[in-house]
Amino acid sequence: MEQSRQNLQSQFFIEHILQILPHRYPMLLVDRIIELQANQKIVAYKNITFNEDVFNGHFPNKPIFPGVLIVEGMAQSGGFLAFTSLWGFDPEIAKTKIVYFMTIDKVKFRIPVTPGDRLEYHLEVLKHKGMIWQVGGTAQVDGKVVAEAELKAMIAERE
């Protein structure tokens, strides 16, 4: 197991993400992971398109991607980081685990996210003990911070 974490690849495509995260359409909010350093940090992104169902109501004639979904995307990225830091890329173990949100702190929304944006999640491990992980970071578009947050989650057995 230690060997798999040391040799963990740094980029993951959607077919890999689907093997680790339990989320599915319309709630999977990570398209690709472009950097991952076990126990340290992750950079991932979601491409925001006008075809997102959420834009039917948020808001007609002024589409803005909801802040709560930005935070959820950050949480999913953090969950991927926590899982792969503990078990490497292991789809069989992923079938037996689930990551639960525990707290959201220091959330700030700075700039609206709109169709055509590439929403990047930049998260670092703040601390972890056993199955409890705390991550913090930003969501960015074109290098500008659009949101920031600290998140705490717990990895548990799936029932």
UniProtKB/Swiss-Prot annotation:
GO terms for molecular function: (3R)-hydroxyacyl-[acyl-carrier-protein] dehydratase activity. The active site is at H58. One of its GO terms (cellular component) is membrane. It holds the Pfam family FabA. SUPFAM superfamilies: Thioesterase/thiol ester dehydrase-isomerase (SSF54637). It is an enzyme of class 4 (lyase). Its main location: cytoplasm. It comes from the Bacteria. It catalyses: a (3R)-hydroxyacyl-[ACP] = a (2E)-enoyl-[ACP] + H2O. Its EC number is 4.2.1.59. CDD domains: FabZ. HAMAP family: FabZ. Belongs to the thioester dehydratase family. FabZ subfamily. This is 3-hydroxyacyl-[acyl-carrier-protein] dehydratase FabZ. It comes from Helicobacter pylori (strain P12).
